[in-house]
């Protein structure tokens, strides 16, 4: 990494320019801290001796005379993207010319590459005495005159060339002014850019001093500004145009009382004495940084970007295509479905109702409103994608620029390359999906480039980065560190705010930070003056962002937004950690040098701190309590931060209490130890860094390292010191050796250990290691299950895994695998197969409804439990209900639970399981849900289990245990309603079918008798058993028994089951005045339906009538079958809708034809000009732009100029060909030269090849034709297209041609016709998918 001050050997030249006389008056050369002999040789100027010239040549190089000359050098340096660029008019002048001989002054103030133009203004002030507000700075770059701000008139850039001052013929107060500025003053806007661009490689700038105009005319100006109109002419026609740092009041003060400027406007005219003092201190500190930079880089460069010393914790990548791409973000939003992986999308666009934000989210989304309240500047779509619990955010703007951002844990130690690679892998599938949308997303063609494409620019910004200085300081040393930053604060390099925390030093680094959004100040001010709050900012702020220099309110907001990058330095036991927030990659490299030069100076050189302020290795060895624990977590957080993987895990400080935690050393630290000390260390592993780590146990009472198994969620072994050494052949010796070799201790290791050691059965209440057993609690084993088993059998609960990557509370999953004697992954694969069923939605009492299909549910099961690549979001417990149902389906196994609530046990069983238990055929498992985990219950013999883990987990009808469970289940359902068997007992009637809803509950029975139609008999929602009675998931049938047959059955039912008597309370009547059913009272309260009748049944005559405005069945049908074949009336409406919009479809084809005709012609003109131009000669460049202006507008010229400046000649023509220009949209003008009849004939000739004629229209689904594109390119299923041509009835085509011709010849219709580019019929009509929720907000 190069860190040099180029301005030391190629100094900045500042030439003063007098616009009144159009002459250059003096040049100041900023030499900086050069050797004394160089300074002396420079100042001799024309009296330099050969020795002086030799000194200058040795220092500045062979071209020293050019570097110290008065040439106006054009085309040097880097491009300043943020600055207003103006074409050099053909004035007969070349920019590389020698000026008349003028006075040259030499300044010892240093210029640095990290100086912004705001800094340059201050250094010009101390060198020349011209305060910042009087300076109009301009310079040349790439043959272009540039200034340090942007002046906009009605949104368009205003040409700013102070050399044209004398060309203005209108005067006020003796000064030339541009009167047109005053007449449009409300449309003027000044954007201050001084703080957002570095001087970089600009080595010659010019300054026009306002005083050269004002001082000679002060009396005349004073008189003129007494008149408001003349004042406005002066201010807007001259001052705001060239010296916008001045507010109207400040300009008036400058004219009337110039000596009061420093007092009234200290930011515009700072104290010269204070400024000189600060700049000299800044120069001293920055020169020191440059002097030490290369040495420090060489010392630390090997580790600077390595995983151990760098961690990117958040970042944003910006992808900027080199060509303009028009992307319809509204359509992308509409066509892109929300899924569990991409659970939320937000779009901002301009709809028919104004600025609109639409958000949609999958029902599994945990933050459905995220980003919906964001402030947008341009049409934008935001997508959030989850990969392995990590959220990635993609933001795409309508010009094709897009941004990718995410966050990472510091422990992941991502460097810049891995961040780019990770984000690229995330973005590629989404970009491919969007590109496949074709013209629906890209109405003018093109596609979004991938990050690997050569036609893009990539930048990394908004980064938060942690880096580590590999030395430690004592508390006194860290205090010394803080005090040394005070000089940097006095120099203005940093800013310290607020109270400081112990062990942390927090400040804002200001110097050289420039990558801000200049528009952010506007947004903040708009927020502060929104509805309901009084606006306390001067209205000039909205016109001029230099207001921070003359308005204290704006200054405070400016400092908040642009005050620097937040830096935090942490005092740690093992190193010094530095966090940098919201920085770019360029800023990281720059800040890293400043920070590490500062830190290295603490331990090297004449200013190094005292030895007793450095934290020694001995201090680490004698660390106590919290410091030891902190050192372990700092050096290996993956091992010691257990709750990173399981929020319920016991923390390390409890597992290994003081003074038992060991001391950890890195390999570098071990190398510096004496050989005798190294022999005492135990070699283990650093799980965070993936390298060896070494441990010692310094406390005399606990001198032996041991490794704890079964505590870490990922089965890592945890180091902890013990009193005694593990003896050979013991269990502890085996565990320690396994951990030191494999670094983990898992179930298989435990099984291996079982064959070597015997174990006792644990008491209930403790956490049960994998494959260990524990006794059942006394009240369950000895009371509830009394006499159900015989010795030597025992009841026990068996230890299983409790955690899994991507999901917490995984004990149930592992319990089911143990019960079924299956490998966990094999179980997941089998139940995933069972999940992929049309009735997936009934799983988990309707929890399956969260998914759009059984395939989606099956996929998520595999991703989570087999591949472990996903998370279950907020359904982290709902999955358990789904799994229990799937196990019941696959293995006919039902589970009951004993839940331990602090010693009080609750018996829990689902209604469907109760039904199974009460049926003749049953097979159950018993599971204990405790605070320590979820475990299966078993019957085993202790010795048998120790030998081969044999146990009984499943209980059937013949087991005594089943009798206990069955009696408990009967007790739980004793208050339930009649069961289906009761209905079976009514003579002459049988249950023909059970109707099941989407929550998998039975809601009605269809009773068969000797009639043709079944009786509809509702019941309270209840679980059902799988028996010989068919089940039906469809809607309530329409063909049902009459009231007479229904009432006959109810009468028999009431007679046999008086406790459940059905008593009607109201008659149900539909909107056709038909009687369709009744509502029952009492315990039932259910809707009984029968075949519609016009006659009120006699048995119901005295009851009130309840009108059903909408039949609930119709609502269910709309929900369950929204895409079924429409009613005939709907089909007629769709046909009419289609015919009414055929004209818009025809316009799409019409414009597509014109794009191909006209834009190709214009492009050929541009290509011919490009090939004939020598871009190395200014006269040839001027001729190129002059000719270009004959057939393209100013905005297109700006676009072409930007392409030529940012692209090498080899690729420039290719980029031009791909780009979209304004001339691509100016299509109708050539056609207006035709007569009406001629135009009709021409249009027929153009469009007939695009039309597929037909006689009549078939069924049309309206939902498919909201988004429409040319049939030539459409990638969507569009019913208006056939064979890539538009389908139009023969009798309509002639009419449309006449309408189109009339519209083209009508100038008032131009904008209406061009609106078809929107690509939608109704921009607020969106595709409705299952599992998606859409909300719309207007933004005003």
Curated annotation (Swiss-Prot):
> Is Secreted included in the keywords of this UniProt record?
no
What does UniProt give as GO cellular component?
virion component
- Give the originating organism: African swine fever virus (isolate Warthog/Namibia/Wart80/1980)
> Which CDD domains does the entry link to?
Ubl_ubiquitin_like
The UniProt keywords, alphabetically, are:
Transcription, Transcription regulation, Virion
Q: What job does this protein perform? A: Putative initation factor.
Similarity field: Belongs to the asfivirus G1340L family.
Q: Where in the cell is it found?
A: Virion
Q: What is this protein called?
A: Early transcription factor large subunit homolog
